[in-house]
Amino acid sequence: MKTTMRKLVALLLSAALLTSAFAGCSSGGSGSSGTESETGSAASASTGEESGAESSSTATGEVTTLKIMGIDKTATVDSGEISLSDWVAGGSPIYDAFVEKLAEYGVALELDLIPEDQYQTVCQTQLAAGIDADIMNITPLDDQTRLNLVDQGKLISINEVVENHSEGAAKEYYTNGNGAQMMNKLALEDGNTYWLTDITIALNEDDEVGQGAAMSFMIRQDWLDALGLSAPTTTDELMETMKAFQENDVNQSGEADEVLSISLSDFSSGLSNFYGIGRTMSGELTYVNTETGTVESPWYHENIQSYIEFVKSLVDAGYVDTSDQLDEKKAENKIAGLFDWAGETWQEVGITVPEGAAAAYYAPVVLKASNAAVETEPYLCWQQGYQLGGNKYAVTSACEDLDAVGRLFDFLVSDDYRILTEYGLEDYSYTLGEDGSYNAIKDAEESDAQQLAAGCALWTNASILPRFELKSAQDWATELQGYQDAGKTMGYPETGFEKKKEFFDEYSDYEYKLPHESNPELAPATAEELDTISSITSDLTTYSEELLTKLILGQQSMDDWDTYMADLERLGLDQLIEINQARYDRAQGNA
């Protein structure tokens, strides 16, 4: 494998320390995969404040090196594109602080960083050749492959690490703290959990688990303002709004090309929520109704035909982009509405508006379904207060020093790790407010500080380590204000993006909410369940996507509805619902 494909980065206290004092934790050396590599060095470390007692290695200043295989995470900031390997190579005070804190736990990291677009292939190659990393990002592997690794004894249970090798902090966190739910929800049939994942927790003013951010269908507020229109509140009014946009050539293109971005093959675009139907993402046919604790499918919902008829009417009127070219048409100032995180501002970036026109501005809308067969209140997509991520990080059987892994886990659940990951360094990437809030330094010149102002550290979010995000009520209030304030530098110096913040102010206590993702926190499927899922998913998904698309485009008739439902049942939709219900019940401790 070429050096351009893999960047092997060793984080060591010194070359002498490596050669004279310690062998690496993994049984395979850094060159055991037969690849060329680039190596760099930096002082490793971390914090020990929350560990009950220093380990012997920490007390004597000794450091054990753990090898982690993961993605070389990249991001684009004002200074240009940056990557985790850039940080490791030097020049990032935030990463240097991460290394220093980690060393206080007696741990250093050797990183095998692989470009994201090559990672899945490298993972599969690594499995065939033999795993040589102590910890591995196994996110790209499918469920069956992960179960096979467990059956083959190639993954060490997280239970073993935290119960027998933690010095206290990780054991408490995953036994009695916020990680206990994760351990229960991700447990396999043997009762053990074999990978860590990200945990996001949003607290309310009583420091209890509340709710997170929201996703919403959004419409161009600047176009509404240009025509003196109020935001639509019903699906009928959305039709009238689109008619006004096109008839008045609101984007000044000379053509009736103002359109909505709506997926025609699945229920991921947010409009189905206004009919009381839960959101399913591409390739998924069920969702969890957290109000009732039941797994449902959009196809069996009482308002499904009404939803299809509405979207078809939008398409027939020429109000929907059927080209699947969202980014291109958005940049060309043609996308009138889309679905995304309600407060974020990245959709406005890169849109070119005519000279003299107001800057692009997407504002959330909540629509009551005018043609619903069964009247319902609009449902909103909200992130749950306790949210597990989709990334997976496993300890492999190649690791020879689980005590070092236990100390690493102790660091991961510490406030030091969380603050470095989310905010970086005080007075470098954030300032601490009198009310205890973390305020990003928005005009930082350093690229790593710019990244922390826009997101989180590059070592997490599908890179090498899990993310533990804890938002206090004050953090959330600061973030909400940030949504509005962002608009002050994006064309609205007086008001900012006030409609984005107003949405949260108005709907935070709204009664009718469903998770923003289709199937939150399903327990891992059993081998038997996986066999069934694998045998039915391909044909079932293909049929569903083709059917929905053809019904919306008028290529198939709604008159044959009973036949379609019989086909879905025959292809296994009822089986899929039953399996996912059992998985949800297990995750909730009800089975």
Tell where the protein language model's regions lie, with residue ranges.
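Bacterial N-terminal signal peptides that target proteins for export
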Residues: 1-12
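Conserved N-terminal structural module of periplasmic/extracytoplasmic solute-binding proteins
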Residues: 10, 25-218, 223-237, 282-287, ...
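C-terminal motif of bacterial Sec signal peptides marking the signal peptidase cleavage site
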Residues: 20-24
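Loop/turn elements at helix/coil->beta-strand transitions in domains of secreted/extracellular proteins
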Residues: 62-66, 104-109, 129-134, 154-156, ...
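Extracytoplasmic/periplasmic substrate-binding proteins
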Residues: 72-101, 146-148, 202-218, 225-231, 265-474, ...
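Helix-loop-helix "hinge/cap" segment bordering the ligand-binding cleft or interdomain interface
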Residues: 159-161, 190-193, 197-269, 288-334, ...
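Conserved small-residue motifs centered on glycine
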Residues: 419-546
